[in-house]
Amino acid sequence: MGTLPWLLAFFILGLQAWDTPTIVSRKEWGARPLACRALLTLPVAYIITDQLPGMQCQQQSVCSQMLRGLQSHSVYTIGWCDVAYNFLVGDDGRVYEGVGWNIQGLHTQGYNNISLGIAFFGNKIGSSPSPAALSAAEGLISYAIQKGHLSPRYIQPLLLKEETCLDPQHPVMPRKVCPNIIKRSAWEARETHCPKMNLPAKYVIIIHTAGTSCTVSTDCQTVVRNIQSFHMDTRNFCDIGYHFLVGQDGGVYEGVGWHIQGSHTYGFNDIALGIAFIGYFVEKPPNAAALEAAQDLIQCAVVEGYLTPNYLLMGHSDVVNILSPGQALYNIISTWPHFKH
């Protein structure tokens, strides 16, 4: 499919309008309380634009009703913490607050922590957004630059999303190659010399650490360091048992990394990547930031050749008589690609 003509609008607009755009707040459109917690680091460098079909509206009351339905679908059907976008632009020419300026969206895996996601909605299927909607989006972007939310040299990647794929029931999730991985040196890992992996790995095993969770990077680094000490000093492992650990801050922490065997699952340590979510997830699953980070890491492993493309994904409890990864987390990973019970 060729690039939609309006998608290029923001490359050529002068962006001289510095007036504050009219933004319909979450309270005004009747949103449920915001449950997302992963923060954006501002200013972001990217803008991602989507168009949502099947939500036709030309009045604020109707557009608000459409957004309430979208939020319900996002939370209760897909399992996200809220709507996927930072802002949504109605064909009525109004900007509607999604998760806002400071919270990461869930619109485009690999870009959520470095971009603002803006979705157009309300226009007839097959038609471009109205001039009023494009003008509102232009004003929003100008304001974002003025207030320091968006870099003046921002990039709008051409991800070439098909309109037919933008239905919220079937979102397209383009990814960049790899997430940012917090290295061993950052969390002050002890130096070790352990056996090498047999790469590419054939399996991914999802685990939970069953201890304290963390939502701030400094806290996660402390938890990872303590896990390494426990594994080495109490359980006599060669190193921390996991290849990577994922925090509720959305961070991926290098355990033994790609090339070293883990100590997570007897019989699989040399052929499986062990990815551990930091925390206890029997009743409540990890947050969206953590789940996305893990999925990005798996995709990264395939792209970089550390994991065979026809890999199998399993929960820890599928191969060991253990609670890990917890039923709440297990219920989610059982819907992921390549899952095998």
From Swiss-Prot:
Peptidoglycan binds at H231, R235, Y242. GO terms for biological process: antimicrobial humoral immune response mediated by antimicrobial peptide; biological process involved in interaction with host; defense response to bacterium; defense response to Gram-positive bacterium; detection of bacterium; immune response; innate immune response; killing of cells of another organism. GO terms for cellular component: extracellular region; membrane; protein-containing complex. N-glycosylated. Transmembrane segments: none annotated. Residues 77-179, 200-325 form the N-acetylmuramoyl-L-alanine amidase domain. Pfam families: Amidase_2. The keyword Repeat applies. GO terms for molecular function: N-acetylmuramoyl-L-alanine amidase activity; peptidoglycan binding; peptidoglycan immune receptor activity; protein heterodimerization activity; zinc ion binding. Keywords: Antibiotic, Antimicrobial, Disulfide bond, Glycoprotein, Immunity, Innate immunity, Repeat, Secreted, Signal. The keyword Acetylation does not apply. It comes from the Eukaryota. It is found in: Secreted. Its main location: secreted. Induction: Up-regulated by exposure to Gram-positive and Gram-negative bacteria. Glycans are attached at N113. SUPFAM superfamilies: N-acetylmuramoyl-L-alanine amidase-like (SSF55846). Pattern receptor that binds to murein peptidoglycans (PGN) of Gram-positive bacteria. Has bactericidal activity towards Gram-positive bacteria. May kill Gram-positive bacteria by interfering with peptidoglycan biosynthesis. Also binds to Gram-negative bacteria, and has bacteriostatic activity towards Gram-negative bacteria. Plays a role in innate immunity. Monomer. Homodimer; disulfide-linked. Heterodimer with PGLYRP4; disulfide-linked. Belongs to the N-acetylmuramoyl-L-alanine amidase 2 family. This is Peptidoglycan recognition protein 3. The lineage of its organism: Eukaryota, Metazoa, Chordata, Craniata, Vertebrata.
